[in-house]
């Protein structure tokens, strides 16, 4: 076993962590689609999926089998390469962002010193998936949905980044592990409450979730930028949306709610419970809020979220300078 050097062991452990995180996040995203339908049924005083398996427990398996056997159709006048590339980017962009999230003190795939910047870069990469899907489909509804999505995502990514600068200033680092360790005694949600509110709103918008789902509004755009997709390509878009929810929920926990910190229970359990809570909040928001007009969404971002993030950053900088004196 002389070939098993310490460097090789580190590489193998990193690969193992990446595979485990990949399987867990994809599984959580898939099961969230089933849980969302059950919870929406509960909120709306009706039954959710309850036909396949005991209490609908095998509905997810039935959906996966149906997705595998559906025709993988590509429109005749579409750009085939870009049309195929778009769902792959949508699936992998926010999945890669989860690599920087520390699940426990010893379990993180990539402990980057520029962790937050890496997340913002991956969130920006997701815009290309939407643009590619809308433009390559050669469909007017798809293109309109892509234009809406790109404008909305680029706008709310400004607030997404600015809302994190207060957290970075307090921790003195872009490293996610350092930010969690800085919350050992006080969670960032207390001194950075406005930053948390803005980040949560922008996170919902970046995931294109209700009430910020105008890019795929069924009543207006007939499902928006992925109207021409079917089979596994549509499945990648579908699961990618829920992976985005898992990633944003995990980032909210890591940046504002102490990450794995908590009494009595093991660190991983605390992280999982907090993340599951915010995943349920995504579902509750969908069940309870109406969909505003597109102009109202953009106006809310630039007239409410942007001033709020700037005020939060200004107050944070003033407090840090006052404490340094």
Swiss-Prot record:
Transmembrane as UniProt keyword: yes
Record family assignment: Belongs to the complex I subunit 1 family.
Chain ranges passing through the membrane: 11-31, 81-101, 114-134, 154-174, 186-206, 237-257, 265-285, 304-324
Official protein name in the record: NADH-quinone oxidoreductase subunit H
PROSITE patterns, A to Z: COMPLEX1_ND1_1, COMPLEX1_ND1_2
GO biological process entries: aerobic respiration
Subunit and interaction comment: NDH-1 is composed of 13 different subunits. Subunits NuoA, H, J, K, L, M, N constitute the membrane sector of the complex.
Primary localisation category: membrane
Keywords tagged on the record: Cell inner membrane, Cell membrane, Membrane, NAD, Quinone, Translocase, Transmembrane, Transmembrane helix, Ubiquinone
Membrane-related topology note: Multi-pass membrane protein
Catalytic activity field: a quinone + NADH + 5 H(+)(in) = a quinol + NAD(+) + 4 H(+)(out)
Function: NDH-1 shuttles electrons from NADH, via FMN and iron-sulfur (Fe-S) centers, to quinones in the respiratory chain. The immediate electron acceptor for the enzyme in this species is believed to be ubiquinone. Couples the redox reaction to proton translocation (for every two electrons transferred, four hydrogen ions are translocated across the cytoplasmic membrane), and thus conserves the redox energy in a proton gradient. This subunit may bind ubiquinone.
Enzyme class, spelled out: translocase
One Pfam family per UniProt: NADHdh
Organism: Klebsiella pneumoniae subsp. pneumoniae (strain ATCC 700721 / MGH 78578)
Cysteine-cysteine disulfides: none
Enzyme Commission code(s) on record: 7.1.1.-
Underlying gene: nuoH
GO molecular function, one term: NADH dehydrogenase activity
GO cellular component: plasma membrane
InterPro entries: NADH_UbQ_OxRdtase_su1/FPO, NADH_UbQ_OxRdtase_su1_CS
Recorded superkingdom: Bacteria
Subcellular location: Cell inner membrane
